[in-house]
Structure formats: C-alpha cells, structure tokens
C-alpha cells in the first residue's frame, strides 16, 4: 500500500510584507521537511493592497537527498540555488542599482564561502558524501 506524502504549510516562512504562508514541506521525511519544498506562485506586488498576489499554482523544489539506506533522491544542491539567487540579484542590480542589492550580493557571497569551507572541512575529515557530522 502506497502512502501519500502530505505537504504542510510552514507558517513562519512568509515573504515580507505578506503574512500569507506560501511555502510547504513534507515534515515526515526524517529531516523535518528539509529536502522538498512546494511554493505558491506569485504574480507580483499589488501596491494598492501593499502585498504580493499569489495564485493557486505551485512549483516544487527538490534538494538532493541521501537516504539512510544509501539510496539517493536526485535534486538541487543548496549552492546551486544560492548561485541562481546571486546571479539574479547581480543582473537586476545592473538594471536597478541599489545599496540593498549590494547587501544581498554580499550575504549570498558569504553563504557560498561558508558552504565551500564546510565542504573543504568534510573532505579533509573524510566524511564528504557520508551521513556523518
């Protein structure tokens, strides 16, 4: 018998200034939902209502997951998603320069550097790719 995995809203993951939860996970995956996210799509910001407009369509992001039995669920790496965000902010900053964009670029660059350092540490300790701390 196949069990259906149920997505649940994550109430504290909202996009400012909206109060509407638009991100869901499957919290019973053994990682509290850290590998698959379902997101409600947005059509932009409504300046009259001072909030984002969300529609009844979703997209799913699956992160790579090594399971306890050694099997792997293919998916994105966190760094790939961060690189996409960094590329997007840099390109938008070319068209609409902003000090806030520069702060985002700095933050994403710091995140990627921390990822690199963590990977280097795990490689040096011989645990990269293993389910070990």
Model-flagged regions — what are they?
Residues 1-48:
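Short, charged/polar N-terminal "headpieces" of proteins
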Residues 26-28, 48-52, 70, 97, ...:
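Generic structural signal for short, flexible, solvent-exposed coil/loop and linker residues
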Residues 30-33, 44, 70, 75, ...:
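Residue-identity detector for glycine
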Residues 86-129:
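Short, compact, well-ordered microdomains
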């Amino acid at each position: 018998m196949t069990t259906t995995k149920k997505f649940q809203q994550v109430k504290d993951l909202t996009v400012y200034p909206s109060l509407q939860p638009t991100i869901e996970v499957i919290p019973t995956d053994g990682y509290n939902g850290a590998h698959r996210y379902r997101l409600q799509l947005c059509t932009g910001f409504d300046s009259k209502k001072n909030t984002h407009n969300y529609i009844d369509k979703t997209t799913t992001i699956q992160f790579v997951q090594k399971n306890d039995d050694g099997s792997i669920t293919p998916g994105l790496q966190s760094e790939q998603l961060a690189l996409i965000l960094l590329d997007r902010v840099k390109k938008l900053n070319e068209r609409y320069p902003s000090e806030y964009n520069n702060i985002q670029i700095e933050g994403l660059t710091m995140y990627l550097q921390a990822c690199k350092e963590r990977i280097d540490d795990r490689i040096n300790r011989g645990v990269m790719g293993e389910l070990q701390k």
